[in-house]
Amino acid sequence: MHGRQFETWSCQPPGALSETALQAWLQAMPAGVLRLKGVVQTGAGQWSELQFAGRSGRLRAASAPAPAQQQVPAIVAIGLAGQLPVAALQALVAGAAGVRVAGRPA
């Protein structure tokens, strides 16, 4: 039943994301995102945990995954069905990675 009420979006960033960009991102989360979490690489050998719920978010240092875990960076967002701003989330991740999205400055 919940599957019809909610929609999810996820991505696996291909490289390190800017901590500064992620902090700004958490302060200006697009409307429609109810919950977001993930573990991402923010520098060479540096990992961060990303959390957003309600109207607040945080970024904190995380332990690097053990090689046996083969963990990849990932972000997951949840919103109400039909209201999750997928294009905005994709643009935010691309901007944090320093990638230019067509029609938008990086």
Question: What positions do the PLM features span?
Answer:
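C-terminal accessory "lid"/substrate-recognition subdomains
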Residues: 1-73, 81-106
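Flexible loop/N-cap segments at domain edges
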Residues: 77
